[in-house]
Amino acid sequence: MGAATETFYSVIRRQGITRRSFHKFCSLTATSLGLGPLAASRIANALETKPRVPVIWMHGLECTCCSESFIRSAHPLVKDAVLSMISLDYDDTIMAAAGHQAEAILEETRAKHKGQYILAVEGNPPLNEGGMFCIDGGKPFVEKLKMMAEDAMAIIAWGACASWGCVQAAKPNPTQATPIDKVITNKPIIKVPGCPPIAEVMTGVVTFITTFGKLPELDRQGRPKMFYSQRIHDKCYRRPHFDAGQFVEEWDDEAARKGYCLYKMGCKGPTTYNACSTVRWNGGVSFPIQSGHGCIGCSEDGFWDKGSFYDRLTNIKQFGIEKNADQIGMVAAGAVGAAVAAHAAVTAVKRLATKREDADHNS
């Protein structure tokens, strides 16, 4: 049986993994995808019966941060995803082959799995001067991308570079760096933005496709809803401070040490859709806001050209912002003071009434 036609289960059994451990893996995977424990049996059945999905991973203009993130996935571990769940037949960054040998593997994979492989793209193609600003295997990357996209089942655009253009496309964009969906228009494309995306988001998308044999539900921008349906602000652990009007005014002030909201320091959490505040990074250990720095909005289109990362958002309409953040703390303090005064007044009235009742009773 060929490497790509083996199932995930047959591979892990050959590696000495017990069935109990396999079902534990399926349960953890279902939970990490937000599907609940009932989906574990479906995942187990799929991984037992479906052949591993062949994947071709290509690199355009990028810094490889998406690959760096991917290899740090904890749920599932990247070794399980790469060595067992999928058949990663080509990735010129981590594969042993190089040069003509690597190109031969690419052509062989394309011919052998025509219409069945997933094309994962990290980075983007520059279109200016015939694509000569990015050469891969002696050809402009854009030509290679179009050729491999023709026979792909689906395309995954990893990171902000492939999804939106990112810093390579920053104005005036001399190389004409272009997002994947602007070049390939006849194939389904899953955008997984971020600079880089969260590791578990990347492996989660791969796991979903492998398990259910279809693409995850996408939003209107082409992002998987399971990871990009909520703003970071919605689940941020500092949200109560935002609602209470408690903001960091400058780095290392008392409010910063107390963990108050970073909105005034330029945090883009209120306008950024991602899973950072729920999935978090490094196996769920932390995320930028938790480490004391505001969100820079790296999963949103055009974040690199929207001014300083430390400029406060001014066009947000929601509780806590539309009233002017400078006044919220004063208003909140006033409200608390009024509540305390009202409570004291009510208590005094009750005590006075009690004394009168006692006096009437004694007389």
From Swiss-Prot:
Any one Gene Ontology molecular-function term assigned to this protein's record: 4 iron, 4 sulfur cluster binding
Binding-site residues, [4Fe-4S] cluster 2: 233, 236, 261, 267
Xref: InterPro entries: Cytochrome-c3_hydrogenase_C (IPR027394), NADH_UbQ_OxRdtase-like_20kDa (IPR006137), NiFe-Hase_small_C_sf (IPR037148), NiFe_Hase_small_N_sf (IPR037024), NiFe_hydrogenase_ssu (IPR001821), TAT_signal (IPR006311), TAT_signal_bac_arc (IPR019546)
Post-translational modification: Predicted to be exported by the Tat system. The position of the signal peptide cleavage has not been experimentally proven.
Signal peptide, first to last residue: 1-46
Membrane topology annotation: Peripheral membrane protein
Highest rank taxon of the organism: Bacteria
EC number annotated for this UniProt entry: 1.12.99.6
Keyword NAD recorded: no
GO cellular component, one term: [Ni-Fe] hydrogenase complex
Gene3D superfamilies associated with the record: Cytochrome-c3 hydrogenase, C-terminal domain (4.10.480.10), NADH:ubiquinone oxidoreductase-like, 20kDa subunit (3.40.50.700)
Co-factor binding details: Binds 2 [4Fe-4S] clusters.
Cofactor field: [4Fe-4S] cluster; [3Fe-4S] cluster
Catalytic activity annotation: H2 + A = AH2
Binding residues for [3Fe-4S] cluster: 276, 295, 298
Subcellular locations according to the entry: Cell membrane
Biological processes, Gene Ontology terms: anaerobic respiration
PROSITE patterns: TAT
Binding site for [4Fe-4S] cluster 1: 63, 66, 161, 195
Similarity comment text for this entry: Belongs to the [NiFe]/[NiFeSe] hydrogenase small subunit family.
Function recorded in the entry: This enzyme recycles the H(2) produced by nitrogenase to increase the production of ATP and to protect nitrogenase against inhibition or damage by O(2) under carbon- or phosphate-limited conditions.
UniProt subunit comment: Heterodimer of a large and a small subunit.
Name of the molecule in the record: Uptake hydrogenase small subunit
Gene: hupA
